[in-house]
Amino acid sequence: MDNAPALAAAADSSDPRTGLRAVAALRRLLEQLEALQVDNAREHGWSWQEIAELLGVSRQAVHKKYARRASAR
């Protein structure tokens, strides 16, 4: 996560190869952060609906994406 500022800067590169690589890396980082915070919210007793509202998605979408992960813990 320490490299997020460098990745954001690289995403603004005029070199498409550099920019696209940075965008892909930022996407992976974002997925990791989202999963971490969904786990955190569930551990704090949040409902799927509460999480979904803050992520701007449906309850079904967030449940489908993370329910298996949550039950594995």
Residue ranges and their predicted role:
Residues 53:
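Alpha-helical residues within the helix-turn-helix
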Residues 70-71:
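C-terminal flanking helix
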Residues 49, 60:
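Key DNA-contact positions within bacterial/archaeal DNA-binding proteins
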